């Protein structure tokens, strides 16, 4: 996982005596050949299952437990076309691997999957749980805790579906985005059913150093389909239980689960279980990146595959093009309707105007030949003239409205035509890319094997910290002051004991802690695969 420069020019026998039965020196060539041999054997998955048994029996052994699942993206620097994830670096979307980790409730990474960079976490959520339980040999997972990336109705229904075939129910616990709920839709359950949430329903949740309340929490029920039902005639419901955490600035965090209401202890415990993601998983990623080189890639062997990314872009462009064509067709229908309305208005105006002019002409004739009551005829003439002016004004107003609609539709037509041309260009581009550009996937076997070693190192560090130091030292202190500490290897005659004698420490506190750790280590009587007893001591 690291290549210290000391190993490149290492000429002594100590490292060889520990790592190889022959006692020969171990350099880069030895370690590289070993890794290549492991890769050629295709033992990554079998290795993961075997190590999982060890971790589970050592750290857990529970009949049931919650697990934390999240993805970690590792960027790959290559000129080849390989799958890309939703991760940017140096002003571009990076290709890489998506590694999905399953961690236990105490933070130990137990199992992982190495996938192409375009793999979404939702596609690996249930498969990695299934692999975990198959390796353990029984149903042990009762809760899967993930971030908001996996919060969807489809995921909740997937968990409901698999519970039909399980003896132990398994539930999903995740965070909801702010656009997935309305505050008014959060309901409190009482004896009479459901009622709106009130400020008095919240109880104190977190306190600051001065014992002042930082946040409040309450348990509510929420219809996940409430947003969709606003636009539907036939309404359906899907109820989830939510822990609502409110901060001082009234910002809400809504944590949702499909666990039945009767099985949820309280909103506080539900929130605690979700927020435990940070120490159990997010902090472990940070730790492993620093001490286990989690971000380092291993193995760049590629194989050519179907260009699914170009195919995805092509289908998206074709869908957009078809949508624009439908929009244009609908718009042209509206445009034709407006044109027809304008022609009808014009014809009707001419007809009405001609009718009024004929009436005025007849009135003028009657006035000229003094037929009928002259006052009535003049009043009627004035009325018809007034109607003619009103008719023209009304016509001009209606024509103005129709012309404004015509102008707006013409503007939209130009925009849609531009979009159609743009989508046609995109379709041609991605069709050419699909036909002519090779697409590769990186063989993940070597990286998968090395990730097993990285998980092994992380769990070994956690085991060392908790077993030999009772969890009283931080990981940084453990690495710098104890694991990387210098000393000598003393081998008595016969070679049946390896005694590691560590140099003195600077402070009495560190020396005392290390001597206590050496005492526990020696009492465990740890032996190598060859039967050699390992002992540790601090020089006086």
Label every PLM stretch briefly:
Residues 267-299:
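Short amphipathic alpha-helical "interface-anchor" segments enriched in bulky aromatics
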